[in-house]
UniProtKB/Swiss-Prot annotation:
Gene Ontology BP, a term: nucleotide metabolic process
Cofactor note: Binds 2 manganese ions.
Protein name listed in UniProt: Phosphopentomutase
GO MF annotation list: magnesium ion binding; manganese ion binding; phosphopentomutase activity
Positions that bind Mn(2+) 2: 298, 303, 351
Pfam families: Metalloenzyme
Primary location group: cytoplasm
Amino acid sequence: MSKFNRIHLVVLDSVGIGAAPDADKFFNAGVADTDSDTLGHISETAGLSVPNMAKIGLGNISRPIPLKTISTEDNPTGYVTKLEEVSLGKDTMTGHWEIMGLNITEPFDTFWNGFPEEILTKIEEFSGRKIIREANKPYSGTAVIDDFGPRQMETGELIVYTSADPVLQIAAHEDIIPVEELYKICEYARSITLERPALLGRIIARPYVGEPGNFTRTANRHDYAVSPFQDTVLNKLADAGVPTYAVGKINDIFNGSGITNDMGHNKSNSHGIDTLIKTLQLPEFTKGFSFTNLVDFDANFGHRRDPEGYRDCLHEFDNRLPEIFANMKEDDLLLITADHGNDPTYAGTDHTREYIPLLAYSASFTGNGLIPQGHFADISATVAENFGVDTAMIGESFLSHLK
């Protein structure tokens, strides 16, 4: 019998809690990640008030320097710790795959200076369309169409760009490059990025519509991902008949592997929380696992090095936690964590190699305190033990500590 009938895992994308022990091996603009501290530096420079997460025990997590504006709780409502990454990477897919029990020893490739000419030329030859070279770099998806959409409407050139993650994205105006044509180009791009030196996690078709100054991305986005190299705990749950619900980009990250119910992409964090709440309310969801990613922290504020915006985004999530609590059952477990860091005060614009926080809450708890410090995969090991399935490659369960 499961200790918790439902477990809900929410990933606050990039909300790290201090440099990892191996941060000296990871860099931003030539600066090692050793002084990175996403939550700490936001708290220090922008001020941070997250009373609902603080009540669970966020301020009680062991740190060299306490979070400046988040106090410790003498009697928290939950259990907390911080977790270290084992895998050799600090991207979204690596973080999520490890959370679900895998150890990634060969990270995906990222292209901070844009894709090499060899890849661009192959795409041009296949598609019969030129590529706008100025867009070939890490770019905000909305900014890149604002900057190059007018040119694409005139010339029919492709907008090919990347991000901090191992992805190749192609944006195309639906009136200029039909969606089906864009899909075929992306399928080809997927076929040439399956091994080093260009092993990419995802190829993303990014259709949009509108006029210059008023472009809008459409719902015709399509991801061409790779599945995890072996079964994760998601697969083990699904194989055992335990329903799994994906909210946000979780389905894309795992290429649908082990997902029994995809609840769709998020338009924003707020929309993602709405979808999570709707998922919690589903009458058929009496037992199982929900997995939510909220990406605005990372995409809108971490990469853009905007600590005030990041702070406000954290405030927004914290303000909505009571709604999530209100839609949980007494025997539900909520786990709040992250997948990597992205310190908005740090050098460069890339992710940062950090510990991630873990907050555990259930209305059924009679105790509280600290969970032993462990690793990302401990989350999936805990989920696995709760539902009586095998773990994946790595991870130690902390289920017995939740009382």
